[in-house]
UniProtKB/Swiss-Prot annotation:
Expressed in which tissues: Ubiquitous.
GO cellular component: nucleoplasm; nucleus
Transmembrane residue ranges: none
Molecular functions (GO terms): 5S rRNA binding; DNA binding; zinc ion binding
Top-level taxon: Eukaryota
A UniProt-annotated Pfam family: TFIIIA_zf-C2H2
InterPro entries: TFIIIA_Zfn-C2H2, Zinc_finger_trans_reg, Znf_C2H2_sf, Znf_C2H2_type
Protein name, UniProt field: Transcription factor IIIA
Species assigned in the record: Homo sapiens
Zinc finger (C2H2-type): 40-64, 70-94, 100-125, 132-154, 162-186, 189-213, 217-239, 246-271, 277-301
SUPFAM superfamilies for the chain: beta-beta-alpha zinc fingers (SSF57667)
PANTHER family: TRANSCRIPTION FACTOR IIIA, ZINC FINGER PROTEIN
Length: 365
């Protein structure tokens, strides 16, 4: 083997790696060094975070930008998430699906995520005897979770467990999740649409984008525009070559509608001549059969007025679709009173059943 001086001379004219290769040529061949694991490094200033997976870096970058690219498209929801996995887990709250079943003997509990199933199994079936005991004198209280013990011990020390580190704040919280939620009040969510708006919550940012940066959705058939995708989806039914429609059951009418609401409105206003909802705007006086129609009309006089969301009314005696459309209202029965039969032996509900056959669902060619 060459003396160390040879190595020094080689270093002066070559790179360090080449020098050591040259110095070791006369010795036994060395095995190749294992490749270092690839790291994905955050490019934001003053941030040294790095990850072994690209998706982990993508999720981390969202913390800098405030972006949540995975949005729930269920009507009326609009929640957004950093990872597609979080969105998939959230969608299960809409569907009610719980695909993960506990395999422990005698336990049939179901969960919407694998992690929740794992936590349940560890807590209920594996660590039944494991207890976290308070070490303070004359206490000895026990807890199933370590975090519960830590929160309890704050009562002894009178020190906040999770404290906000923002200068001038000093608020403290009982759990890390509540502290994390509070931290967003300091950081905020920056609007990415070219304005300087900063929201305190993600929901507030979504509301700002919807109201300030409205993006009209265009119908490719008739060029009509809509504010929401579900409005466009409903509108596209009018262009479909075949569609389900509701036909007016009144004799000699034959009018058809694409929604039950419009059919009900037609029967009340045209056949029953019932339009009890009057516009109170000065000089207007228009009347409507349905309260929702009046609410929509009111926007004509006050464009800045938001359309009211329909509230779910308290449950009341159910009526069939036929009774709504025909105008027939079955008589109320006292509690515990049995059904009285018609002269032909049929119950009063048979009138509704017969009416139902007149509400036709047609297919337009």
């Amino acid at each position: 083997m060459d003396p160390p001086a040879v190595v020094a001379e080689s270093v002066s004219s070559l790179t360090i790696a080449d020098a050591f290769i040259a110095a070791g040529e006369s010795s036994a061949p060395t095995p190749p060094r294992p490749a270092l694991p690839r790291r994905f490094i955050c490019s934001f200033p003053d941030c040294s975070a790095n990850y072994s997976k690209a998706w982990k870096l993508d999720a981390h970058l969202c913390k800098h930008t405030g972006e949540r690219p995975f949005v729930c498209d269920y009507e009326g929801c609009g929640k957004a998430f950093i990872r597609d996995y979080h969105l998939s887990r959230h969608i299960l709250t809409h569907t009610g699906e719980k695909p993960f079943v506990c395999a422990a003997n005698g336990c049939d509990q179901k969960f919407n995520t694998k992690s929740n199933l794992k936590k349940h199994f560890e807590r209920k079936h594996e660590n039944q005897q494991k207890q976290y005991i308070c070490s303070f004198e004359d206490c000895k209280k026990t807890f199933k979770k370590h975090q519960q013990l830590k929160i309890h011990q704050c009562q002894h020390t009178n020190e906040p467990l999770f404290k906000c580190t923002q200068e001038g704040c000093g608020k403290h919280f009982a759990s890390p999740s509540k502290l994390k939620r509070h931290a967003k009040a300091h950081e905020g969510y920056v609007c990415q649409k070219g304005c300087s708006f900063v929201a305190k919550t993600w929901t507030e940012l979504l509301k700002h984008v919807r109201e300030t940066h409205k993006e009209e959705i265009l119908c490719e058939v008739c060029r009509k525009t809509f504010k929401r995708k579900d409005y466009l989806k409903q509108h596209m039914k009018t262009h479909a070559p075949e569609r389900d429609v509701c036909r007016c059951p009144r004799e000699g009418c034959g009018r058809t509608y694409t929604t039950v609401f419009n059919l009900q409105s037609h029967i009340l206003s045209f056949h029953e001549e019932s339009r009890p909802f009057v516009c109170e705007h000065a000089g207007c006086g228009k009347t409507f059969a349905m309260k929702q129609s009046l609410t929509r009309h009111a926007v004509v006089h006050d464009p800045d007025k938001k359309k009211m969301k329909l509230k779910v009314k308290k449950s009341r005696e159910k009526r069939s679709l036929a009774s709504h459309l025909s105008g027939y209202i079955p008589p109320k029965r006292k509690q515990g009173q049995g059904l009285s039969l018609c002269q032909n032996g049929e119950s009063p509900n048979c009138v509704e059943d017969k009416m139902l056959s007149t509400v036709a669902v047609l297919t337009l060619g």
